[in-house]
Amino acid sequence: MKVSINTLSWSNNNVEVVNNHKMVMDHFHIPVNYTEENINHGMWIDRTLNTVDADIFVFMDSDCVPLSRVALDESIDYCKRGYLIGNAQVTNCISAKHDLFCAPSFFVISKEMYFALGKPSAVNNNDRRTDIAQEFTRRAVEQERRIKMHYPTSFQGVPQGGIWRLSGYGYYGIGTVYDNKFYHLYQTRFAKNVGLFVDTCNHIVSGNIGGINRQYDCKSEWAGVLPIEDDYGY
């Protein structure tokens, strides 16, 4: 089966982040199609799905990297078995606080699944209360299809505005590790976060993922200890 691995970067993306992303991908011998274009994220996903000749599509943010080659290969294998795969996320700002979905930070879908879901658009839709790529999971849930989400286990720092609740599961934030398989920085526009990404990428390529900073446990209760962006019910 033909697999297409894709990463989008905009002209204002931090060059150091993009270069370290490429370093990790090269280290694992992962062939990535990098698109350098100022295009809406969802529109880029839609265009890729409709113009690239592939059976399986992997979308990965420029600040999201696998901790191993096995992590990527396992996700692709799940996709071959009929699963929709991605990092677990919710979007608190659109009244969908408990609506977990496979986020586009790391997202895997087959062409067959895409057509079976009715070729939904990845563009965010306020009427449907969906964020980027969320409609894919919404449709998969409605059709009772197989879904595999990678859940956060630790994070490194507090985002501007406070840490994020993941429905009833726990919390996530800057430098989140998912299932010890993927790492997503978030908020790369802030220079203080870039160093965390560089440090993590260096640990990955040196084979020392055990040395990655995992300061905060995602399932611990941080209410009253760390600022929370959207404290449900208050």
Model-derived regions, located:
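N-terminal anchoring/stem segment of glycosyltransferases
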Residues: M1-D53
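Short, surface-exposed basic-aromatic patches at helix termini and helix-loop junctions that form
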Residues: M23-D26, L49-T51, D73-C79, E142
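Residue-level recognition of beta-strand->loop/alpha-helix junctions
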Residues: Y34-E36, A88, Y151
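Short, high-confidence coil segments that cap the C-terminus of an alpha-helix
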Residues: A54, K80-L84, R145
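Short aromatic/hydrophobic "clamp" motif used to bind/position activated sugar donors
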Residues: F57
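Catalytic metal- and UDP-sugar-binding loop of GT-A-like glycosyltransferases, i.e.
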Residues: M60-S62
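Conserved catalytic core of nucleotide-sugar-dependent glycosyltransferases
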Residues: V65-R139
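C-terminal catalytic/acceptor-binding lobe
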Residues: T130-Y234
